[in-house]
C-alpha cells in the first residue's frame, strides 16, 4: 500500500493509474498526425485549397478543447473510468466513419471529414483527455510536475508511433521507426487508414480507461506531508471555476498558454508539408515518384521525431519545474520556443530543420505538462478537471489560430508537378504547392517572446473572499 490516513480499504498501487494514462494518451496523441494525411488527401481532392485541407486539423483541436471542459466536469462528477471509456468510443467511431469520405465529391467530402474526423474525433479526445491527468494529479500530490508530465507524455508520443503507421497504411510498405524497417504493411489507402486507426484507438482507450480510478478521500502518499503556505502568502484553497475565472491570473495564464500552443500546433500540424516544401523547392520538375516518396517519408519521419521531443518535453520540464519552480521553467520555455520559431524558416537542411521543430516540440510538450500543474498549484485539486477544462480552451484557440496562420500567411512559391501511381498502378501527374511559411513562423515567435514577459509578471492569486480568513 502507498497511502496512510483516511483510507479504510486497501489502496491500489498508484502506478497502475499511470499505465492506464499512458495507454489512453498515446492513442489520443494521434491527433498530431494530420500532416501525414494532408498530401494524400490533396492528391485525391485536388480542388481543396491549403486552407481547406487544414480545416479538419483546426476543428478537431477546437472540438477537443471545448470537450475538455465538459469531460473535466463529468469526470469530477462520475469518475474518470466511465468518461474515458465514452471518449474512446466516440473517437474510434468518428475515425471509422471518416473512412467513407472517399465516396463523396470534393465539397461534400470535406464536410463529412469535418463531422466525423474533426467534430466527433475532437469530442472523443476531449472527453478522455482530462481523465488521466486529473486522476494522476490526485494520486501524486508529492510529484505533481513530474506526474503531469508523465500523464501527458503519451499524448506527445502518439505521433511517434502512429505517424509512420499511418504513412505505411496509406502507401503500403515498411513500418519504420527512427529509420529502422520493422515490418511490412499492406496498402490501405488514406480512407481505409482512418478505419484501421479508428479500431485501434477504440480498443486501446477502452482498455486503458479500466485502470483509472480516483484515490479515496483524504489520501496522501506514505511519508508525505503537504507543504504549508508561506507566512503572509496565499492560503491553499480550492477555487470553484467561477472563482478561478474571476482572477486576473487565470486570464494572464490563458493568454500565455494560447501563445505557446499557437506556435507548437502550427509546427506540429504543418511539419510534414513544410519539410516537403523546403525539399522540393530547389528540385527540377517533374519530381519522380521515388524522389517524392522519399521526401514524403522524410516528412513523416520529421513528425515522428518531433513527437519524441514533444513527449520528452512533458517529462523533462515537469521535473525541472518541481525543482526550479513553474514560473522559471515557463519563462525559459517561451524564450527558447520564440527564438526557434524566428529561425525556423532558415533551417532548410534536414538536420537543421529537425533541430528547429524539435526545440519547438520540446517546449510545447512542457506547456501541456506545466499548465495542469500550475492550475492545481493556484486553484487546488478539488475542481481540477473542470478548472483545467476552462484553461485548456487556450489550447483549442491555439489549435485554430496556429494552423490558420500557417495557411493564411503562407505565400505560394510554386506549383510543382510530381509523379504518383493510382489504384491501378498507373503513373499519374499531380501538383504539390510549395509554400513559404516565414510570416507565420515570425508571428508565432513574437507571440512566445511576449508570453515570456507576461509570465515574468505572474503572481499566485489570493484566496477567494469566501475562503479568506
Name each region found by the language model.
Residues 34-39, 163, 242-319, 402-407, ...:
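Extracytoplasmic gate region of multi-pass secondary transporters
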Residues 41, 126-140, 147-148, 366-379:
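Intracellular juxtamembrane helix-capping segments at the cytosolic ends
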Residues 55-73, 304-317:
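Central cavity-lining transmembrane alpha-helices of secondary-active solute carriers
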Residues 89-106, 336-348:
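C-terminal ends and interior cores of transmembrane alpha-helices
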Residues 94, 108-127, 352-366:
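Hydrophobic core of transmembrane alpha-helices in multi-pass small-molecule transporters
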Residues 155-217:
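Helix-loop-helix hairpin linking two adjacent transmembrane segments in secondary transporters
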Residues 198-230, 452-459:
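C-terminal membrane-cytosol helix-exit motif in multi-pass small-molecule transporters
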Residues 257, 263-266, 297-374:
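C-terminal transmembrane helical hairpin of 12-TM major facilitator-type secondary transporters
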